[in-house]
């Protein structure tokens, strides 16, 4: 398998599976999927072997490292991949053991005994297990010594003095308090972090109200550590041993992703997924129904319970059909509360991540779904392979500039981006700036160097789009135009019948209508990507031109601000935008400033901005 053939991986925790002929040959976990998988392709040895043999790679997103740890353990145990050679026998897996004693302690073990203790695992990653144990040892005051003495120890251990042990060895532990700590540890290892965090926060509040700030600080640190490693819930298993399937679905315009997770004995052991097209104007229920009909008519085993993320019309009929096929009751339902809603949340998250990955892969291959969507939405004669985006940037009338970016096949072509200094304007005028930039693009030297775009995107509303259309008319060029207004991300469409009307007639044209698309629509996602790039490109150029000299010249006019205060403001605020946007309290916090001086600065900047003429419309 070549690195370029990989799916687009997220930078979040999860499990990855290398397959050959559909069979897993290596399963691993990562805190950062993209980084970890790329490391395998750079390494030799065993990694080099299975990356060359692998024909495909899939991933499962996890909420955090612990959930990834559990998923990895379940999947390795289920599939026993060839290259996970050191982990093939359960007796080699490390477990976490909560001992069966009056005052239990947490230990790592590789032996499971029938001794009444609570065992958690097995886990294939010993280092991750040790990290989990270290956090619990640090944050929960269970004893650390291997055996309780028959008689009191003459003095408490260091852990007791550090607040990391309740001191059962010296009879200092209160049974109820120790029991609560044990229950917290059990809950975390069973994937129930939320109630533990809630109780710790309540205890922290009580301690603070009682002015026991040292205890409140310890509880705060404990909450932060638990949230960092465990999140709020682990979804890789449920409390009871149960067999079920649970589904998640996500949609973006005509594309959709459905993912099905198989849980057996209370643990996730496998997953199936489908990337669907033609899903525009289709509800989530209909998408789920299409998946159910395709998957369960071929499934060799159907569990007694199937959890759905949304209700759909034929669920009861499918439940009846599958019950007859299985010879027992098969229930389909949409959970509303409890740990089963957590399973749906996990599936929904993976469906959304999977959909983003599939769409990003299409974009990387030059088959951006947004191009077809734009063709349909804007009534264009063909897919807009080349898109040019335009935006202006200025602040308080200084250094008025414009930016132009180029996208081909949905991908940025930075080598063809261009910057323009707007000429002859003493004050900001967005419309005139846009008109000048477009006219220069299609009549100057760039007209011969660059091909005509299939679509022009204007960052702005009706006024900016009309200015661009005026410039095109004066230049004698016919190019489809669309605007994107920041408010609600509205599309601004010229021509009675969209951009195609301008192409066909070349007659007088102005903005005819506006269109509001769902935020997940591929056409809107494509335009937002272009808009964001041209905005950042224009702003970065403006900042470069303005520089510290321009900033200092404005600061020189600030009333009541001497050299020392100017230098302090320049050191603290790197741009005039930052200073203008800062609250008075933040300005006053700069060394040498006072609240009165900060208010004076704020009033000066507001008055200066109000005096500058602005483009209307």
UniProtKB/Swiss-Prot annotation:
One of its GO terms (cellular component) is cytoplasm. GO terms for biological process: DNA damage response; nucleotide-excision repair; SOS response. Keywords: Cytoplasm, DNA damage, DNA excision, DNA repair, Excision nuclease, SOS response. Residues 11-85 form the GIY-YIG domain. It is found in: Cytoplasm. CDD domains: GIY-YIG_UvrC_Cho. One of its GO terms (molecular function) is DNA binding. Residues 194-229 form the UVR domain. Transmembrane segments: none annotated. Interacts with UvrB in an incision complex. Belongs to the UvrC family. The UvrABC repair system catalyzes the recognition and processing of DNA lesions. UvrC both incises the 5' and 3' sides of the lesion. The N-terminal half is responsible for the 3' incision and the C-terminal half is responsible for the 5' incision. This is UvrABC system protein C. It comes from Deinococcus radiodurans (strain ATCC 13939 / DSM 20539 / JCM 16871 / CCUG 27074 / LMG 4051 / NBRC 15346 / NCIMB 9279 / VKM B-1422 / R1).
């Amino acid at each position: 398998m070549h690195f370029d053939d990989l799916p687009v991986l997220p930078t979040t925790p999860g499990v990855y599976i290398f397959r050959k002929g559909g069979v897993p040959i290596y399963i691993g976990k990562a805190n950062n999927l993209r980084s970890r998988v790329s490391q395998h392709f750079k390494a030799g040895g065993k990694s080099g072997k299975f990356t060359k043999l692998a024909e495909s790679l899939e991933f499962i997103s996890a909420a955090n490292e612990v959930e990834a740890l559990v998923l990895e353990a379940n999947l390795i145990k289920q599939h026993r991949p060839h290259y996970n050679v050191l982990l093939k026998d359960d007796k080699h897996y490390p477990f976490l053991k909560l001992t069966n004693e009056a005052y239990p302690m947490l230990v790592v073990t590789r032996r499971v005994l029938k001794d009444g203790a609570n065992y958690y695992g097995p886990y294939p990653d010993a280092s991750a297990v040790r990290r989990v144990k270290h956090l619990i040892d640090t944050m929960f005051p269970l004893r650390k010594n291997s055996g309780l003495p028959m008689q009191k120890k003459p003095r408490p251990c260091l852990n007791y003095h550090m607040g990391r042990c309740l001191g059962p060895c010296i009879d200092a532990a209160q049974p109820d308090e120790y029991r609560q700590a044990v229950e917290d540890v059990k809950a975390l290892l069973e994937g129930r972090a939320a109630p533990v965090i809630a109780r710790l926060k309540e205890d922290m509040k009580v301690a603070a109200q009682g002015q026991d700030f040292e205890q409140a600080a310890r509880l705060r640190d404990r909450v932060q550590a638990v949230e960092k490693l465990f999140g709020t819930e682990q979804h890789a298993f449920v409390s009871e041993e149960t067999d079920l399937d649970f589904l998640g679905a996500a949609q973006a315009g005509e594309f959709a992703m459905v993912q099905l997770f198989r849980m057996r004995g209370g643990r996730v052991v496998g997953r199936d997924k489908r990337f669907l097209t033609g899903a525009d104007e289709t509800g989530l229920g209909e998408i789920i129904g299409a998946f159910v009909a395709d998957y369960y008519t071929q499934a060799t085993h159907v569990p007694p319970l199937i959890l759905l993320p949304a209700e759909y019309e034929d669920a009861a009929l499918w439940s009846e059909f599958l019950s007859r096929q299985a010879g027992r009751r098969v229930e389909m339902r949409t959970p509303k509360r409890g740990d089963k809603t957590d399973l749906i949340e996990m599936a929904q998250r993976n469906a959304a991540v999977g959909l983003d990955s599939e769409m990003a892969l299409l974009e990387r291959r030059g088959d951006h779904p947004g191009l077809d969507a734009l063709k349909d939405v804007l009534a264009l004669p063909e897919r807009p392979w080349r898109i040019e985006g335009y935006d202006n940037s200025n602040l308080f009338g200084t250094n008025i500039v414009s930016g132009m970016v180029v996208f081909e096949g949905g991908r940025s072509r930075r080598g063809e981006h261009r910057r323009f200094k707007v000429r002859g304007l003493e004050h900001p005028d967005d419309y005139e700036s846009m008109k000048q930039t477009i006219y220069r693009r299609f009549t100057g030297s760039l007209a011969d160097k660059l091909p005509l775009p299939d679509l022009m995107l204007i960052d702005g509303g009706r006024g900016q789009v009309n200015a661009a259309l005026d410039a095109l008319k004066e230049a004698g060029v016919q190019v489809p135009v669309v605007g994107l207004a920041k408010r609600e991300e509205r599309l601004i469409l010229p021509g009675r019948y969209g951009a195609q009307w301008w192409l066909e007639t070349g007659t007088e044209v102005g903005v005819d209508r506006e269109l509001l698309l769902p935020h997940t629509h591929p056409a809107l996602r494509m335009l937002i990507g272009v808009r964001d790039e041209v905005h950042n490109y224009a702003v970065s150029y403006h900042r470069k031109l303005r520089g510290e000299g321009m900033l200092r010249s404005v600061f020189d006019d600030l009333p009541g601000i001497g050299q020392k205060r100017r230098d302090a403001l320049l050191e603290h605020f790197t741009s005039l935008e930052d200073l203008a946007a800062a609250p008075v309290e933040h300005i006053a916090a700069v060394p040498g400033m006072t609240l009165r001086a900060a208010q004076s600065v704020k009033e000066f900047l507001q008055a200066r901005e109000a005096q500058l003429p602005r483009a209307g419309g």
